[in-house]
Amino acid sequence: MPTQDQLLQALATVIDPNTGKDFVTSKSIKNLQITEGDVAFDVELGYPAKSQFAAFRKSLIAAAKGVAGIQNVSVNVTVKIASHSVQRGVQLLPNVKNIVAVASGKGGVGKSTTAVNLALALSAEGASVGLLDADIYGPSQPMMMGIEGRPESVDGKNMEPMENFGIQVMSIGFLVAQDEAMIWRGPMATQALEQLLRQTNWRDLDYLIIDMPPGTGDIQLTLSQRVPITGAVIVTTPQDIALLDAKKGIKMFEKVGVPILGIVENMAVHICSKCGHSEHIFGENGGKKMAADYKMDYLGALPLDMQIRLQADNGRPTVVADPDGDVASIYKAIARKMAITVAAKAKDFSSKFPTIKISKDT
């Protein structure tokens, strides 16, 4: 009968293409059982990758069958997403494991489109995902997610999130008329956002994606200090002026102790739909160079494509409108890279410890 060591040695030859590590070293192999010629085990991933389950299973079965004496192999691939650490001194959010801020130093770089497609990509890969539209002066997620109406409240205090495409969504856009301007000062806007965040009944989320307001002003700084953020994704175009403002966003998150999960370069190249000629309208590799300069992960580049805009405007973003297309595949790859970076962070164990209260009477 084959031994466990023989089997693990064979399985260690299979590399996870997302992490570059084998499944044995990463301690992903669980519940290994050998009964004569039959083998069964689980593979537990720390990030969502449902579209790759079949490929993982096939590679692992082939490796296991390479061991003499093994005839039948059963592999069950699962995902277990853990809570990870946030800034010190910030109150955690119940039922939300990880909060990811999608930010940009300036408007118009495609931050909201990136945020909604990242949320949908994580969901498509098997995660439970929420989306908070924190762009209080220009909320766009209700339109992009194709959601109308107002959120309901069972107890008169907390709101139930709106939902579409399997994503839980909250936005100030659900609470005001579509053409109403939010003429609010910073403190009022920040308070409203905190209420949206903490008075929404989020239900067992692996990830809450926050579509941050553009810029690095008072609202962004206050949110970064008060919201328990696992990490931030910076969206930029290759254009020099966009990169200049993106660097300011990086500095802001660094000052408040929020790690940068990576850089997304949007509108990186335009491919003519008539002749196929590719042109770098906003410059070339600016986001990639910035990521290298700051020693940050370069999560990926997206094209300047009219379909991305049309699909978002029609309330069916690219990942749901064309799930098997090239652009959706890029969004899914970016989402996986981001989730892997989150999984590599220190886990949050605060819920494992009792709260210690000190009073004058003790």
Regions found by a protein language model. Give the residues of each.
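Conserved catalytic-core segment of NTP-binding enzymes
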Residues: 90, 206-207, 213-314
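Walker A/P-loop phosphate-binding motif and the immediately C-terminal alpha-helix
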Residues: 99-136, 250
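Phosphate-binding loop that captures ATP/GTP phosphates
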Residues: 122-184, 190-198
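C-terminal boundary of histidine-terminating zinc-finger modules
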Residues: 314-325
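Extreme N-terminal, non-catalytic leader segments
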Residues: 25-28, 35-103, 335, 339-342, ...
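Glycine-rich phosphate-binding loops of nucleotide-dependent enzymes
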Residues: 170, 212, 225, 333
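Short glycine/serine/threonine-rich phosphate/pyrophosphate-binding segments
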Residues: 108-118, 139-140, 212-220, 242-245
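N-proximal, solvent-exposed amphipathic alpha-helical segments enriched in charged/polar residues
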Residues: 1-30
